[in-house]
Every structure is written in structure tokens, then in C-alpha cells.
Amino acid sequence: MVVDSSALNVENDWKPERTLVLLGRTGNGKSATGNSILGKTMFQSKARGKFITKECKLHKSKLPNGLTINVIDTPGLFSASSTTDFTIREIVRCLLLAKGGIDAVLLVFSLRNRLTEEEQSTLRTLKILFGSQIVDYIIVVFTNEDALECGETLDDYLEDCPEFQEILEECDDRKVLFDNSYNAPVSKKDRQVHDLLNLVEQISKKNNGKSYMADLSHELRENEATIKEKQKQIEEMKGWSSKQEISQMKKELEKSHNEMLEGIKEKISNQLKESLEDVKEQLAKAQAEREETEKKMNEIQKLSSDEIRRLREQLNKAEKETASLRTELNKKCTVL
């Protein structure tokens, strides 16, 4: 059974579960990957981009072994077109959806698309926003297996992609290849999900079973427990309190709950704003350094071109002089 959840519905679920967050550029196949993991089409996904994820959404599925898989799909959070307010709002929404903490961050890349500058900076951005330990929870997911040459493996493809090698090195080479096409064999899709969940369990063991953002999860659960206790007290008062009093208490409780959530969102937002300023500053600095390097390389190339042109002109001049001397010499030989 697959159910949906809202961003502000924080429930205490005793059953074992794993929460996975999909991150990546729009068009890389995040939603399709989420559907493959869930085993059902829950996230809207169209190759032509008719349906684009505009906000974080969560769907869940229970495996035969009883494990609940929560999958959070996100819009393109770190694209150049995303505003700071949009990025902060959706990150907060994502964190509230991940009520029990995040067990793995799935960084999704498409083998069909060229790696953009924003994608190359994704790890740096994540580390600035959430701390360097975030890399301990990242799994790199490659989509569009059909983009590989006949007989070519993912490792073969990556040999010629140093930018991907750098990302994988930071993530302990945790990677998986997904074929999200409709005609992919069920056995193949099952194997992909199995390989992914094995990596999730490796991450769990490496981090001693602690989910990422567990502190936020603990705060949410504590506040939720307080709310539930007050709800219980209100129910017990129904026998000797008027309907008007009960209604007023429920309104006050709802207000308290909303204020609690707003307080948490504001705290996260303030932290993210400061971090995003650092991200922008560092990315701008890196961009300036890259442009300066390119400028110097162009100058060197221009100097080299000018030097080659000068040498070529000297060579042509020397050849002409040699030809002229040879002509004069031939004339003298003829006279003699």
C-alpha cells in the first residue's frame, strides 16, 4: 500500500523505515527513479518535461519484509534559476517531510546530459549547507543506462569522466545504475532497488544507525509528543467541559502546534540563509578564479599563436631568400 504525506504531518511511527531524498538537476530522472524505488508510479514523470517537480513531495511504500521506504522527490534546488527564497522554502519542506531523519541522499545524474557547472558544485553546496558529514549519506545514482555504448559498463564510461570520479571519491564510490524505462524487465528493476538498499544499509552501519538531521527529527518528535499528550487531556475533559470550552482548547492547541512548526521553520531558514550566502560567495570566488585561469590560458595561447606566426613568417622569408640566392647562383653558373 502506498500513501501520501503532507509536509506538516509529523507522526511517530514505530515500524522500521528508511527515508531517501532525491536531489539533482531537473530532467535527470529523479521522479522516475523514485517511482522505480517505490515499485509504482507515484511521482509525475515525463521525458518531455511536461510535468516538472515544483515542490518537495513524499510517497512511501512497504516492502514484503516489513521495511517502509519513504522517498522524497525535490525540484531542482541548486540550479542557477532557483531563487534563494525558493531554495530555502523547499529545503525546509524537505526536512519536515523527513520526520525521522534522512537515511540517504540520492544524487541523481543522467548519462545523457552533460554535467553542468551547478552539478559539479553540488557537493560543495551541500557541505556548506549541511556540514561536511553529509557526504557520508550520499549515493550517486546514474540514470539512462541506454546512453552507454554497446558492451560499455558504467565503470568504462566513468573512466573518461574525471569530474564524476571526484564526486564518487568523496562518496566512497557509492553508486548505482538505474534503468527507469517502462519496458525494463521487472527482475532488472528489482535488482537495481536491491543494490540501492544494500548501499543504504552500508550507510546506516557506517553512521552507527544514526540518520542525518536526527537532531531536528528528535525536536519534531518531542513537540509532537507534547501535542498528543495535550490532545489526550482535551479528550478526557469532554465529560465535564462544555463544547465551547473544548472547541477553544482545540483551537489553542492547533495554534500552539502551528507556532511550534513555524518556529522550527524559521530557525532552519535563518541557518540556511547564512549558509546560502557562503555558498554564493564561494561559488562566485570559484567562478572568478576559473575565469582568470581561462583568461591567462587564452593569453598564453594567443602568445603562442603570435610566436608561431612570427616563426612561420621568418621561415617563409628565409625560404624566399634561399630561393633568390639559388636563382642568382644558377645565373652565375650559367654565365661561367
Swiss-Prot record:
GO molecular-function terms, A-Z: GTP binding
Key words of the record: Coiled coil, GTP-binding, Nucleotide-binding
Tissue expression profile of the protein: Expressed in pollen grains.
Residue numbers spanned by region G1: 24-31
Location of the AIG1-type G domain: 15-221
Binding site for GTP: G24, R25, T26, G27, N28, G29, K30, S31, A32, S45, N180
Keyword GTP-binding appears in the UniProt entry: yes
Start and end residues of each stretch annotated as G5: 179-181
Coiled-coil annotated residue ranges, if any: 265-328
Induction data: Down-regulated by aphid infection, 2-aminoethoxyvinylglycine (AVG), high CO(2), isoxaben, and propiconazole treatments. Up-regulated by brassinolides.
Ranges for region G4: 143-146
Transmembrane segments: none
Residue ranges of the region described as G2: 51-55
Chain spans, region G3: 73-76
Similarity comment: Belongs to the TRAFAC class TrmE-Era-EngA-EngB-Septin-like GTPase superfamily. AIG1/Toc34/Toc159-like paraseptin GTPase family. IAN subfamily.
UniProt-recorded name of the protein: Immune-associated nucleotide-binding protein 13
Organism: Arabidopsis thaliana
